[in-house]
Design a protein with these regions (language model features):
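Short amphipathic beta-strand segments in non-cytosolic proteins
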Residues: 330-349
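Short Pro-Gly-centered beta-turn/loop motif in secreted/extracellular proteins
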Residues: 354-364
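Hydrophobic/aromatic-rich core segments of domains that either
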Residues: 25-34, 47-48, 176-184, 189-196, ...
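A short, amphipathic beta-strand motif
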Residues: 316-325
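C-terminal motif of bacterial Sec signal peptides marking the signal peptidase cleavage site
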Residues: 14-15
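Secondary-structure boundary elements
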Residues: 41-42, 49-220, 254-256
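Positively charged n-region of N-terminal signal peptides that target proteins for export
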Residues: 1-4
Length: 364
């Protein structure tokens, strides 16, 4: 579930971005890096003889000023950092009791924002770029454009989780599953991995008062929707599947909801990690009453300044250049009432009030 803290941070980021940054050039991004500039220049120097990887590195660096890690942890009375390993507890209530006892002993919770442009080093970025290109060569990823690769496979983060260095491990863990499944495209590869998620992940509150890390979700195998989506996005990108996180704020319930979407042939297909694949989750979003979103927003890595965001005096996360309203990208299902239930027979596209289904024949 999303929290007000996340919305507050996004609002702060948005306000700064709108007021000070009208699109960032490579040189502007480097100038924002401060002492970390030398690390970013090492990346550019490393790829100077590889034009396509150099452009990928430039893409990451240009957009790094908009991204950060949300770091949260306990600080002991002696000033030492501590984060409980939830695998060492029987359940989330035991984790909560442990955290409560820490605060009774004088531990405090510290929250800080660490900006990527000032913190990520050259070896981390080079490793992620090389592994992303390696994944892009897989058969199910071969038809993905360079633009699609940069936006949905290359990025080293999904949202505001602490930057993870798990791409290699996740690739080695999940790649054999797709290879053995002989996936022909990203959609099929996503189906295979999401079925494995059913064994690896479970929707469950951790009891931890902190924003989840990719590592914690993978090791413990539990998390709420934001944790599962962040992990699923990074796991799928690690094996060359173009995936993003999408969100909505509930209008009749507390908090919000996240799910993922995979890119196939220019269209995004929704799926819920460890719950429903891209062949069925959009139908659930449209037909299950409590899942129907009022608005759908896609989390971007590259800041979008094309759409006008007039300054009306209000600071809101909805103005973030990292959010794209994709409510209009609605797929619809043509269903037949078959044996006492509606069953989908075709997927179409909705444009305003018109729904289009192709190649539907027969009358039985």
């Amino acid at each position: 579930m999303k929290t007000c803290f996340l919305f507050m941070i996004l609002s702060i980021l948005t306000s700064c971005a709108i007021q000070k940054i009208k699109g960032v050039s490579l040189e502007q991004a480097l100038s924002m890096a401060g002492e970390n500039r030398a690390e970013l220049e090492k990346v550019l120097e490393y790829y100077k003889n590889d034009s396509i990887k150099l452009e990928a590195a430039r893409y990451l660096i240009r957009n790094m000023p908009f991204h950060f890690s949300r770091m949260e942890y306990f600080v002991s009375p002696e000033g030492e950092r501590y984060v409980p390993d939830i695998r060492n507890f029987t359940d989330n209530q035991a984790v909560k009791r442990h955290c409560d006892s820490l605060q009774e002993k004088g531990y405090t919770i510290r929250k800080e924002i660490v900006y990527d442009i000032k913190a990520l080093h050259s070896d981390y970025l080079i490793r992620n770029i090389d592994l992303a290109f390696q994944a892009w060569q897989k058969p199910w990823a071969k038809d993905i454009s360079f633009e699609g690769f940069c936006r949905y496979i290359l990025p080293y983060r999904a949202e505001v989780e602490p930057a993870s260095d798990m791409r290699q491990e996740l690739m080695e863990y999940y790649l054999p599953l797709i290879d053995s499944g002989k996936a022909r495209n990203a959609f099929e590869a996503c189906m295979i991995i999401n079925k494995q998620f059913i064994n690896d992940l479970k929707y469950k509150e951790t009891g931890q008062p902190f924003y989840p890390t990719v590592e914690e979700t993978f090791r413990a195998g539990i998390g709420e929707c934001d944790a599962l989506c962040n992990f699923a996005t990074m796991a799928m990108r690690a094996v060359g599947i173009p995936v993003v996180v999408q969100t909505t704020t509930w209008t009749k319930m507390d908090l919000a909801h996240s799910w993922c979407a995979v890119l196939q042939d220019g269209e995004f297909y929704d799926f819920s990690p460890a719950y429903a694949g891209p062949d069925e989750y959009r139908q659930k979003l449209m037909t299950v009453r409590y899942l129907k979103p009022a608005k759908v927003y896609r989390n971007l890595f590259d800041a979008d300044f094309k759409k006008s965001r007039t300054d009306d005096g209000y600071t809101t996360y909805l103005k973030s250049p990292l959010l794209k309203d994709v409510t209009a990208e609605s797929l619809v299902y043509l269903c037949a009432y078959n044996y006492y239930e509606w069953k989908p027979v075709a997927i179409g596209i909705q444009t305003d009030a018109v729904c289009e289904f192709k190649d539907v024949v027969g009358n039985n």
